[in-house]
Amino acid sequence: MTIQWPSEAIWEAVVPLLPGFTVEVLPEIDSTNTELMRRARAGQLDPVLLLAERQTAGRGRLGRSWISEAPEASGSTHPIASLTFSLGIALQPQDWSGLSLAVGLSLAQSLHPTLQLKWPNDLWWQDRKVGGILIETASVGALRYAVIGIGLNIHMPTVALGGEAWRTPPASLNEVLPGVEAPDVLQQVVLPLVKCLQRFEAQGFAPLQADFQTRDLLLGRELQCSDGALGTGRGVDASGALLVHTASGLKKISSAEVSVRPRS
């Protein structure tokens, strides 16, 4: 089934903000993030949106896999069960802290008022994950190139990878926005994301802190951190660090290597 991607419309909207911007759509690749990082290390630093209809070695945070299967493999009858793309862009913010939170906020604001954000890089809906973000950077000379990978569930597959039933099913955007398809979502999120990145480059995360708090999944909830700490979510600070009130006081978590889960 041929999918009509809004490549030209996205290019026309974004190129005035990012001269030299291109849009590429591939039927299959190992990972859009991996490909853009390969290009960056080879000196290719132009702004680009790279989309793959299928990723065979997609990656999430902490090395977790994100594989976008063909519809028949996932049990879906829709042309694209998940939307996976990466945006490559040179950025020079004074402080990189909070970038993944800014990206997540932009996506949630573009898509639906009920989407929530789980620190540091996930979109959730009704206590189930609907998407994730992976940000990597490459330094080439004085430039630093950011590769922002995004994966969003569009339709719920009927089976988990490997043919087993889901233990805890993720959410899909079709539950939130009935009838939406991957090309619609792509066109809806890219231009606001570029504007968000340019604002972040100029102002950092601090101006976004209050808006993030309105969608903060962990705020006020009992949390368990992968380092063993237990506490209650107290939001994020102006740098995007997670604040957790523990028995020993207020704990600030700034490392994305620490995983945090709600206990209730």
Which positions does each model-derived feature cover?
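Long, positively charged amphipathic alpha-helical accessory segments at protein N-termini or as interdomain linkers
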Residues: 1-3, 91-115, 125-264
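N-terminal lobe of the biotin/lipoate ligase/transferase fold
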Residues: 1-110, 263-264
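Short, basic and Ser/Thr-rich N-terminal targeting/leader segments
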Residues: 19, 44-46, 119, 128, ...
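Short loop/edge segments at beta-strand edges and connector loops
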Residues: 27, 117-119
